[in-house]
């Protein structure tokens, strides 16, 4: 553990720097770095992430004792640079206390502003500034934040609004004003007293008046917020380890609410929604930062072009816009120039799109934060390619800048243009996060989760979102808010998740208790359908048809770049020609798994399949299989043709036969009629197929060994289709894979059937086709005896679903009953069926690859389980020397990027 727990910064000097984010968190490291490169930052200090972890081991009293000397010295350092004193009524220093983990977690943890205020300090500040409105506005904000974050003042139930907001609304009503900033000094003073009384009533404790007590309460509250529900959920979603901890940054306050020459804002060096190289953001005059970020007031645009675009969407004329909603570029031109120059400097320094917070205090600009901005998948790809073209980063960095999972967003459906032209627009908001979303209205996060769990698609409608809504936002198709701008919590989090979001739709009136939203005099209830266009900000009544997204030139360029560096081929799992074509458009270089059993469930095919199962002689089975042969051949013909010139790996029949027969009374009666036998006979045969443990029973190669005629029919269908295509001038490249091998003898037996059948087929068609015979490694014994199996197999395909199941001894279908407890108790960090277990299952794979190649140096190896599209699993496969990974068609781009990242 680091001995030093507190690092100071200010006045162009800092004890930390940008590369210390693991210790100082992203915020603390960047505050230090901005000081060092000449960006104006208020002085302060950062308490390390190690101290957060220490807090959870030793508790609050001990951590305060351990930190006391360093924090007191750091406060004195800040006092000296600001020329004022913490807690001194005549010349007071106020501070902000903010969280900051090494990975950005917007809004997930807690912030407190204006700390250090009490009645005496407030009076002293009024005497010093001559601005009582500013002082008591700051004071009521501090009591509200401290009451919420440190003392736990929350709404009592989900229908209630924040208890402090309820008090504010009542006081505004009494005074007859609409906006917080129009409250009189007397009303603000009244709010301070009402807030304190509410805290006393609910918690039983007086609001702390000693600034030092306030500071320690806030520091420890930020540490506690690392383990709040929303932070834990966000970390789970983003794959951030609990043990990283959060740093705490304490910084001298600068005030955006000191009057008309003060302001606060959030800005991005490029568009976080579409990646356009356009400086953009929002600001509020006479406000504090939380007003912008929390979406409590809908702010104005920073740039003139941004303001004009906003006005056009909102249907506001240029004259009205310029008069009533001027951009910062127009209202504060000199400050805007300084802000623009500094944002450009920061982007060039960090060589990435920056998300920045700033405050203007009486005409002086201060930066409070910079970080690499959260962005949509579309923006991620465009920004990476643009920075590459601008010479700011190289090709390898461009590949590493893109998150594989976020490519999924580019493949999401968009609204069909014809359907959109006929749809009814019911309101217009801000296009906070692009995409198309249709769903039923819900108003609360827990309802969104419940409805989603029931298989319903929902749109979460809120006045504004807060970090507590994270789980609901994750479950929803899209988010609609009445308040908040493009940089509000809803917008930033939705973009990070790739969720469609329309914010600041001011014409909507949300009633949580009635569970209704009124839009232009029409009332929509919970459960009604609406559609959101996150790209334009338009909201529509009902459901609108969607279509597949069109991929951009930037996407193609990124994929070409990946292919330039990758050492591993990406194939797809496809059971139909349509799936094969889709995957090919996404760049799949072949098929890593075709499941033949999926082809048997069409009406005519299932009848023949059931006939085969019912037969109790070889002749009877062969007669039924002869009916299946043309169907199978036609299926393989379509897939091999769609993947002409590419490897197509076809798995022989794998599931147990009981999966193909009906288990309900009506289904058995229908089957009896189709087969021309009695229902009793059907029941008897179905019962005879029952197994105690079917997943380890009569399936895979065991079916082919007991019924070799099944293997022969499938081989005949595969090679017959290939021969026909070769005669037509195509280049089919079939691979025949024997599933569930545990011993080399099983593979030898099945191989002999395949080779004998191949000889017959080639003689019949008068043409030969090159093909390969391989096996699936999905039983631990097969992995352990890979050297022997490789003598008979030309390739190994690792079926990681079953290999994981048999190595852990977990049933994939039943793991949900205990996995949540395992995750909570940290027995498992991730679901091993989603992320490959590299320590156990991975070692079996590594051993099998190495031992197999010791016997057969040209042995090709690949992975075809669900893990084939999961980025960390793909990187592991590349590391152990696999030739390919195979995944579902829509995960092909994700796997291509992950494979390239493994190579660079």
Locate the predicted segments by residue.
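Nucleotide/phosphate-binding sheet-loop regions of phosphoryl- and nucleotidyl-transfer enzymes
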Residues: 1-423, 450, 456-459, 466-471, ...
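Conserved alpha/beta-domain cores
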Residues: 98-99, 551, 561-904
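Glycine-rich phosphate/ribose-binding loops and adjacent secondary-structure elements
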Residues: 364-366, 459, 463-474, 486-493, ...
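Long, charged amphipathic helices and adjacent flexible linkers at domain junctions
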Residues: 237, 399-452, 457-458, 526, ...
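C-terminal accessory/binding modules appended to enzymatic or scaffolding proteins
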Residues: 13, 19-21, 433-475, 841-858
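Short beta->alpha connector loops at strand-helix junctions that form conserved
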Residues: 45, 482-484, 503-506, 594, ...
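A short, small-residue-rich loop immediately preceding and capping a beta-strand
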Residues: 477-483, 501, 862
């Amino acid at each position: 553990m680091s001995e030093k727990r507190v690092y100071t910064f200010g006045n162009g000097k800092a004890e930390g720097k940008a590369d210390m984010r693991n210790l100082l968190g992203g915020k603390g490291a960047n505050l230090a770095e901005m000081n060092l490169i000449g960006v104006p930052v208020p002085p302060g200090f950062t308490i390390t992430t190690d101290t957060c972890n220490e807090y959870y081991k030793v508790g609050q009293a001990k951590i305060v004792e351990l930190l006391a000397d360093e924090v007191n010295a750091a406060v004195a350092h800040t006092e000296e640079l600001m020329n004022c004193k913490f807690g001194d009524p005549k010349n007071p220093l106020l501070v902000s206390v903010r969280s900051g983990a090494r990975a950005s977690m917007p809004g997930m943890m807690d912030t407190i502003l204006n700390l250090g205020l009490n009645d005496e300090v407030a009076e002293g500040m009024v005497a010093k500034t001559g601005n009582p409105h500013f002082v008591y506005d700051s004071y009521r904000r501090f009591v509200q934040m401290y009451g919420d974050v440190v003392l736990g003042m929350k709404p009592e139930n989900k229908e209630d609004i924040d208890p402090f907001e309820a008090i504010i609304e009542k006081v505004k009503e009494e005074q007859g004003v609409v906006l917080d900033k129009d409250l009189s000094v007397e009303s603000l003073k009244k709010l301070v007293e009402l807030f304190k009384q509410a805290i006393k009533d609910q918690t039983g404790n007086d609001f702390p008046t000693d600034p030092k007590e306030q500071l320690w309460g806030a520091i420890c509250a930020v540490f506690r917020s690392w383990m709040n529900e929303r932070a834990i959920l966000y970390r789970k979603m983003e794959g951030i380890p609990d043990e990283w901890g959060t740093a705490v940054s304490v910084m001298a306050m600068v005030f955006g609410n000191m009057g008309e020459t003060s302001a606060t804002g959030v800005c991005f060096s490029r568009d976080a929604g579409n990646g356009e190289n356009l400086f953009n953001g929002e600001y509020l005059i006479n406000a504090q930062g939380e007003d912008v970020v929390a979406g409590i007031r809908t702010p104005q645009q920073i740039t003139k072009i941004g303001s004009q675009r906003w006005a056009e969407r909102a249907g506001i004329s240029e004259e009205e816009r310029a008069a009533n909603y001027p951009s910062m570029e127009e209202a504060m031109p000199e400050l805007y120039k300084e802000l623009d120059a500094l944002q450009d400097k920061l982007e060039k320094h960090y060589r990435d799109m920056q998300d920045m917070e700033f405050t203007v205090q009486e005409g002086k600009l201060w930066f409070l934060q910079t970080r690499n901005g959260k962005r949509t998948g579309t923006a991620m790809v465009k920004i990476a390619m643009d920075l590459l073209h601008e010479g700011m980063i190289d090709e390898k960095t461009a590949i590493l800048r893109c998150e594989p999972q976020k490519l999924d967003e580019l493949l999401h459906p968009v609204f069909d243009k014809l359907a959109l032209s006929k749809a009814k627009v019911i309101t217009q908001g801000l296009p906070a996060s692009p995409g198309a979303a249709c769903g039923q209205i819900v108003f609360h996060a827990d309802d969104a989760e419940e409805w989603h769990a029931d298989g319903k698609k929902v749109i979460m409608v809120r006045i504004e979102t807060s970090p507590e809504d994270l789980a609901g936002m994750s479950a929803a198709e899209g988010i609609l808010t009445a308040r908040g701008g493009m940089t509000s919590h809803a917008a930033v989090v939705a973009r990070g998740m790739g969720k469609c979001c329309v914010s600041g739709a001011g014409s909507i009136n949300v009633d949580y208790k009635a569970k209704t939203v009124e839009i232009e005099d029409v009332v929509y209830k919970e459960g009604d359908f609406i559609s959101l266009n996150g790209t334009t900000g338009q909201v529509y009544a009902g459901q609108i048809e969607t279509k597949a997204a069109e991929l951009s030139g930037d996407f193609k360029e990124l994929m070409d770049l990946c292919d330039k560096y990758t050492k591993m081929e990406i194939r797809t799992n496809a059971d139909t020609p349509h799936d094969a074509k889709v995957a090919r458009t996404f760049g799949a270089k072949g098929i890593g798994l075709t499941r033949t059993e999926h082809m048997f469930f069409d009406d005519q095919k299932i009848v023949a399949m059931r006939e085969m199962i019912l037969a109790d002689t070889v002749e009877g089975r062969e007669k039924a299989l002869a009916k299946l042969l043309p169907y199978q051949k036609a299926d393989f013909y379509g897939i091999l043709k769609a993947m002409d010139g590419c490897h197509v790996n076809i798995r022989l029949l794998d599931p147990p036969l009981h999966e193909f027969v009906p288990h309900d009374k009506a289904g058995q009666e229908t089957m009896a009629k189709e087969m021309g036998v009695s229902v009793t006979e059907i029941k008897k045969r179905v019962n005879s197929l029952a197994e105690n443990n079917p997943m380890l029973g009569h399936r895979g190669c065991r079916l082919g060994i007991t019924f070799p005629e099944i293997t022969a029919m499938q081989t005949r269908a595969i090679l017959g289709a290939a021969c026909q295509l070769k005669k037509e001038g195509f280049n089919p490249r079939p691979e025949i894979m024997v599933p569930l091998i545990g011993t080399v003898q099983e593979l030898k037996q099945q191989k002999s059937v395949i080779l004998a059948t191949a000889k017959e087929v080639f003689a019949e068609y008068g043409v030969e086709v090159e093909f390969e015979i391989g096996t699936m490694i999905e039983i631990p014994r097969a992995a352990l005896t890979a050297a022997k199996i490789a003598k008979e197999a030309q390739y190994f395909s690792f079926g990681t679903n079953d290999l994981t199941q048999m190595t852990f001894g977990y049933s994939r279908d039943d793991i949900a009953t205990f996995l949540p407890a395992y995750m909570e108790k940290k027995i498992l960090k991730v679901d091993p069926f989603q992320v490959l277990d590299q320590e156990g299952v991975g070692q079996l794979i590594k051993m099998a690859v190495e031992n197999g190649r010791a016997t057969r140096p040209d042995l090709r190896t690949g992975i075809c389980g669900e893990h084939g599209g999961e980025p960390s699993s793909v990187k592991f496969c590349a590391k152990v020397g696999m030739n390919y990974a195979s995944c579902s068609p829509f995960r092909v781009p994700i796997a291509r990027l992950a494979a390239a990242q493994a190579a660079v």
